[in-house]
Amino acid sequence: MNVHVSLSVDARHEKVLVTFLIENRGERRVGLSREIATDASLSRRLFDLRQHPGDVEVPYTGRMVKRESSSLNDYVELAPHSAHMHTIDITRAYDFWPGTHTYLICYEDAVLTDVRQLDSAAKISTEKVMFSYTQR
């Protein structure tokens, strides 16, 4: 599997917008979780968000949806030699501290290396991205 994932953050204009980019550089289709690929809002603590310095976890305060076991319908296929980008507004989903602070964010999950097999999951993770945000 030759998959590359990354995050970027735009914390201007009183919002924290996280853009997830996945590139399938391989020869086979991979399955990407719908919640990171297409969902408009979070339904669980999808990102690891921490204050910097100090490594204090920022509490997730967004909605929590109890889900059934995963099925193949929970994944979006990503063709070989293609990329997918999706942006999610996390401003109201995490309890950002008042004032201006610096944070580190990353994403860790799995992709399906065979889009027909749920048990073909392989771990993916992004590098930590540092950003500053002012909570008013």
Regions from the PLM with identified roles:
Residues 14-18:
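Structural beta-strand segments of beta-rich domains
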Residues 32-77:
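The feature marks short-to-medium sequence segments in extracytoplasmic or secretory-pathway proteins
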Residues 76-89:
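Short Pro-Gly-centered flexible turn/kink motifs
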